[in-house]
Amino acid sequence: MSSVFDEYEQLLAAQTRPNGAHGGGEKGSTLKVDVPVFTLNSDDPEDRWNFAVFCLRIAVSEDANKPLRQGALISLLCSHSQVMRNHVALAGKQNEATLAVLEIDGFANGMPQFNNRSGVSEERAQRFAMIAGSLPRACSNGTPFVTAGAEDDAPEDITDTLERILSIQAQVWVTVAKAMTAYETADESETRRINKYMQQGRVQKKYILYPVCRSTIQLTIRQSLAVRIFLVSELKRGRNTAGGTSTYYNLVGDVDSYIRNTGLTAFFLTLKYGINTKTSALALSSLSGDIQKMKQLMRLYRMKGDNAPYMTLLGDSDQMSFAPAEYAQLYSFAMGMASVLDKGTGKYQFARDFMSTSFWRLGVEYAQAQGSSINEDMAAELKLTPAARRGLAAAAQRVSEETSSIDMPTQQVGVLTGLSEGGSQALQGGSNRSQGQPEAGDGETQFLDLMRAVANSMREAPNSAQGTPQSGPPPTPGPSQDNDTDWGY
C-alpha cells in the first residue's frame, strides 16, 4: 500500500506545480499597449520639481486616458533618478506593454519643452499641458496638494527638490499596500502610515496629496499590470539594496514590509499556529490531508522564487491555491490557537463559512492547556534544573488562572459567537456571578457602590450650593422667555 501513498503525494505535487513551469505557454499573443513615459534630461532643481508636478497632474487628471496615466505614474516614480532613461528601461522589460519614451529638455512657463528625438509636436505638447490642468473637482485649490501654492514654491536646491519628490513618492507607495486587497477600506491605514512617515521626516506636511488623488493613483495601479510589474521590480531592488545607502530604496524597503505576502495571511497564520506549535493534535487522522496540502503549498511557495511574496500584487493565479478553504480543518484549528495565544489576531477577521467549529474549539482548548507547558528544547538550551522547570510551570499556571478570573469581555474568545459568558455576567452584576469567583464579584460590587456614591454626591453638590433643593424642574439654559424684562421692551 505504500506505493499508493507515494503516488498520491506525487499527484498533489503535480497539482500544486506553479503555472508556466513547463514553459509551453504562448508569449506575445495579446495586443500590447503603447504607454508614453516621460523622462527629463535636465538636473536643474526647478526643472526636476516641475517635471514631478507635471507627471503627478497627468497621473490624476480626469482627461487623461489609462495609458497616459500609467506612463505618468511610472515617470513620477523615476523622477528621483539621475539617468531617468535607464530607470525607465527597467520598466520596459515586460510583455504587457510597450513604453514610448518622451524626452523633456525643460519647462518654460509651465509648458514642457520636448526634445526633437521624441517627435512631439507643439500642438501635442499643448494638449499635454491642458490634460495636466484638468484636476478632479475635489482639488478645491486647483492643485493636487492640500496646501495651496505648494507646487508654485521654487525649490532652494537639489536637496529640497529630492525631499519634495520623496514626499510624493512615499504617498504613492503607501497606496500600493492595499491596491489589490481591501482598497475600499484603505483610507485609515494609509493615513496612519503617512503620519508615520511624517514623524520620521520622510514626508513633508506641505506636500500631502488630496485623498481623491491617492484614490486615482490606486485605481491606476489596480487596472495596470504593467505598472504593477514595475512596482514589483522596484520592491525587489529595494530588498537587495543595503540599508542606509539610498534614501529612496530605504523607503521602498520599508513599504515592502506592508506589501509582502498580502493576501497570504491565512496561509502563514496556519503555519505559525497550526504547524509550528507542534501540538499532539496534528496526529489526528482527520488533519493528515490538510497537513499534506500545507506541505505541497510550502514547496510551491519556494518554487515561485522572488515573485512568491507578490503573487497578490501581480494577480498570479497560483494565489488561489493558498486560500484557507484548501485546508479548512487545519485552518480552523490554527485560528482557535491564535485567538488565545495572540490577541493581535483579533483585528484579523478569520471567520469563514467553511470553518469547523469543533476544530476551532479544539484549538482553543489546546492553547489554554499549553499556556503553562514548557518548551523542552529551550529548557535544555537554558539548562534549567527540574526544580526551575516546576517553578516556571507553577508560575505560568498561577498567572493564567489569575488572568482568567479577571472579567475582560473585549478580550474573551468569542469570534464565532460575538459574545462571551463573562461579558453577559458583567452586565447582570456581581450577584449573578459563579460561586467559584466570590472575590471578583465582591470587588465589582464595591466598585459599583463607589461609583453610585460619587454620582449621588455630584448630584447633591449643586443643590447644597443653592441652599434649598428645587421643587420643580431645572431651569432652561439661556435667558428666560417668560420674563418681560428680557424681551427688549
Curated annotation (Swiss-Prot):
Spans annotated as Ncore: 1-402
Region (Ntail): 403-489
Residues that span the membrane, as ranges: none
Pfam family, one: Paramyxo_ncap
Chief location of this protein within or outside the cell: virion
Residue ranges, annotated region (P protein-binding): 1-375
Keyword RNA-binding: yes
Keywords: Capsid protein, Helical capsid protein, Host cytoplasm, Ribonucleoprotein, RNA-binding, Viral nucleoprotein, Virion
Gene Ontology annotations for the cellular component aspect, listed alphabetically: helical viral capsid; host cell cytoplasm; ribonucleoprotein complex; viral nucleocapsid
Subcellular location: Virion; Host cytoplasm
Region (Disordered): 421-489
GO molecular function, one term: RNA binding
Polar residues bias spans: 422-437
Residues the record lists as binding RNA: 178, 193, 258, 348, 352
Record family assignment: Belongs to the paramyxoviruses nucleocapsid family.
Function (record text): Forms the helical nucleocapsid (NC) in a ratio of 1 N per 6 ribonucleotides, protecting the genome from nucleases. The encapsidated genomic RNA serves as template for transcription and replication; encapsidation by N is coupled to RNA synthesis. Forms the encapsidation complex with the phosphoprotein protein P. Before encapsidation, the newly synthesized free N protein, so-called N0, is chaperoned by P.
Domain-level remarks: Ncore is globular and carries the regions required for self-assembly and RNA-binding. Ntail is an intrinsically disordered monomeric domain in the C-terminus.
Record's subunit section: Homomultimer; forms the nucleocapsid. Binds to the viral genomic RNA. N0 interacts with the phosphoprotein (via N-terminus); this interaction allows P to chaperon N0 to avoid N polymerization before encapsidation. Interacts as N-RNA template with the phosphoprotein (via C-terminus); this interaction positions the polymerase on the template.
Protein name: Nucleoprotein
Organism per entry: Avian paramyxovirus 1 (NDV)
Gene name of the encoded protein: N
